[in-house]
Regions:
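Long, contiguous internal "core" modules enriched in hydrophobic/ aromatic residues
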Residues: 11-190, 194-200, 217
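Central hydrophobic cores of alpha-helical transmembrane segments
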Residues: 206-216
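C-terminal nuclease/phosphodiesterase catalytic domains that cleave nucleic-acid phosphodiester bonds
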Residues: 203-206, 224
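Aspartate-rich (DDxxD/NDxxD/DxxxD) Mg2+/diphosphate-binding motifs
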Residues: 4-12
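Membrane-proximal extracellular juxtamembrane segment immediately upstream
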Residues: 219-226
Length: 226
């Protein structure tokens, strides 16, 4: 009921808290995107070149994006009471899923604009982005496979039991999340299969479906799956 109390995080900073750094990087990224977006759109509106200084903010925002998902991963990995979150690759998983789902959503919006307004982003934009998505999704699935190996090969119940519950339920009783998790697995594997084959990845009819499945899979993994 009093959102102004959020300012207390900055008026009384606590650098030993991960939440303080999370709020800092999120606010910084919001300001960067607001300035970059507003300046670029204003230049587009008046049909002029954007100022040269905006380029340096764009470069800064690229590196800043890494900090957002890294700190978010630290929020989870820093809680020793949750074995499923207590993993060194949690931040890397957040980065990989962000670099595949974020560009995937961007490409889907571009395809929607193309269909509704006739705006064509061109192959010079679509092809590199789809390749980045492919690599990031491959890394994302690989990191989750590392989690599975560590959990089940070690035989530590605290690591394996949460995964068993997510996919199989508990003591023979299905959980509501089981169907969602298997859907995420099917969609993730199917989307990566379509993206790995250049003939499918460069097909503008097939690519959107692969991106939709990828986005749903990563959303389930980073929401219901955590």
């Amino acid at each position: 009921g009093q959102p102004q109390r959020v300012l207390n995080m900055f008026l009384h900073p606590t650098p030993n808290s991960v939440m303080f750094w999370d709020a800092t990087v999120l606010l910084g990224y919001l300001i960067l995107n607001a300035v970059i977006g507003w300046t670029t759109l204003e230049a587009e509106r008046y049909d002029v070149e954007p100022p040269k200084w905006i380029k340096y903010l764009v470069y800064l925002s690229i590196f800043w994006a890494f900090s957002i998902h890294t700190v978010t991963g630290f929020l989870y990995a820093g809680l020793p009471g949750r074995h499923y979150w207590l993993t060194a690759v949690m931040a890397a998983r957040f980065l990989a899923s962000a670099f595949c789902s974020g560009p995937a959503l961007l490409l889907l919006l571009l395809f929607m604009l193309k269909r509704l307004t006739g705006f064509n982003p061109g192959k010079a934009v679509v092809r590199p982005l789809s390749l980045i998505i492919t690599y990031a999704m491959g890394i994302n699935i690989f990191l989750y496979c590392l989690e599975l190996f560590t959990a089940f090969y070690s035989g530590i119940p605290g690591h394996s039991d949460p995964i068993v519950f997510l996919f199989m339920g508990h003591e023979g009783v299905d959980a509501w999340v089981n169907g969602w998790m298997w859907t995420a697995v099917v969609f993730a594997c199917a989307s990566l299969f379509l993206l790995l084959i250049p003939r499918f990845r460069t097909n503008d009819r097939i690519l959107p479906w692969a991106l939709i499945m990828l986005f749903i899979a990563t959303w389930i993994d980073k929401s219901l799956g955590l």
